[in-house]
Amino acid sequence: MSTDYDVCIVGSGAGGGMAAYVLTQAGAKVVLLEAGGHWDSRTDSAMLTWPYQSPRRGAATSERPFGEFDGCIGGWEIAGEPYTVAEGDRFSWWRARMLGGRTNHWGRISLRFGPDDFRARTVDGLGDDWPITYDDIRPFYDRVDRLVGIFGSVEGLRNHPDGIFLPPPRPRCYELLVKQTCDRLGITCIPGRISVLTQPHNGRPACHYCGQCNRGCRTNSNFSSPGVLIGPAMETGRLTLLTGAMAREVTVGGTGLATGVAYIDKTTGQDRHVRARIVVLAASACESARLLLNSRSSRFPDGLANSSGVVGRYLTDTTGTDVGGVIPRLMDQVPHNDDGVGSLHVYMPWWLDNRKLDFPRGYHIEVWGGHQQPAYGFMGDIHKYPSGGGYGLQLKRDYRRYYGASVGLAMRGEMIPNADSYCEIDPTTVDRWGIPVLRFHWKWSDHEIRQSRHAQTTLRTIIAEMGGQVLDPMPDASTDFGLQAGGRIIHEVGGTRMGNDRRSSVLNRYCQAHDVKNLFVVDGGPFVGQADKNPTWTILALAWRTSDYIAQQRREHAV
């Protein structure tokens, strides 16, 4: 059978962009399907746009819930593309509909998983071990560091591997106060590890510190898939990009191998099909699971690559709870711009021993504050400030007094996979294209709830030690101590987990489907566990490792 392409990739975010980059460099003829539209931050970003230049003053829109200047088109709800949640459960699903996906507006916090994160069950008896070790993926973390560029500092911390770093920027004023406070409390506080360039790197200029990374960078100084991966892949002449292509199912032939992907052309509404020798899914953890579950046939009645029944299972998200406070030492400042990147300059990696605590996995702490450009709705909680709020001249004076005096601390921690957190096909609901949608089930265990309680206490202690006043009361057990709903941190992974045992996993150690040897997954789906680190750097490294393996298999004519 003749084929149109060597490889078909579904999804253009971190994993899909990396697969396109590596495979085109290796000589493969690749087609990339993206459900959203084209996006080029050099021309489409709202960077340096002032609020007064828009009638909305930067307020949220249906396509940009984080504000109309935000670099991500999509949101928690997309017209004509619903999802459902089981009764009594709490889960929110953020979906991007644009070239590059979520890499256009993410926080660029770029952390490697540590050795213990790949052997969690061995360490504490909970969750499962990965079929790979840190040593297996370390060379690919190194490659990602060298290609993309990341700033940070070499610290030698246990289970927080150092990388190949560019120099970090200096802490801003409020971050210096956080650092000094953490030093007194015995909390580790180090420079952030962020994929924003502080020096020219691989033909891309250094960041000029406008602080608007979330809008998309016109100078391409931060990491996004279109700017760093898809652009160079297009330059090879071996990548065909199809935007507005909503994947419906992975098609299979009589031998049980994947033959391509059926999709809807969203412009015309017509069904299309692209053929390829190899199919790589990178649509996001949940979208890829949905695609497999909807790819049913007589050979695969429960969905493609699902003989284990594990597709969609063991979803996790980063745990999250936040605390904000007002710091009197930062009040009444002369108006100024806090030079720096649009992300944190310092953060607090996990510093305690879980064996001495009542919860088994850790978290890190992220920091925000400073004099960022005001936008619509800024300081909307001023009525919570000491003597703040009111009307007229007094309100204006309060805005000036308190602007830049607030500091926020955010816990981002590890969730242990459980059998009650998963997605499945909703039997009664379809999207505007007639494709069955996902129904989510979610449960936080006592592990995560106790973790959130500990974090709330810790974050409040830091703000109090800074001499600040916390703005909200301590949450209690009725709200899981402030633990946000599943999906709200937008770090959902799992659903097509990797493993050595095909009875309990979907993919092997190279993210290759046990049941279909020419099918691979390179988004967050293969993750066996979450770790207390953000997932993007591991998605990139795993995708590079898998793509190298695909290239090798092609050379050996094994797929």
Residue ranges and their predicted role:
Residues 7-32:
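N-terminal Rossmann-like FAD-binding beta1-loop-alpha1 element of flavoenzymes
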Residues 13-14, 18, 169, 286, ...:
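Residue-level detector of alpha-helix initiation sites
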Residues 25, 29-53, 236, 249-250, ...:
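Glycine-rich loop(s) and the adjacent beta-strand/alpha-helix scaffold that form part
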Residues 37-62, 96-105:
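Conserved N-terminal glycine-rich FAD pyrophosphate-binding loop of Rossmann-like flavoproteins
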Residues 59-77, 82-89, 97, 109-112, ...:
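Conserved redox-cofactor binding core of oxidoreductases
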Residues 77-95, 99-102, 106, 112, ...:
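FAD cofactor-binding and catalytic pocket of flavoenzymes
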Residues 191-195, 207-213, 242, 248-253, ...:
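A glycine-rich dinucleotide-binding beta-alpha-beta segment and adjacent secondary-structure elements
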Residues 529-547:
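A conserved FAD-binding loop/helix module that cradles the flavin
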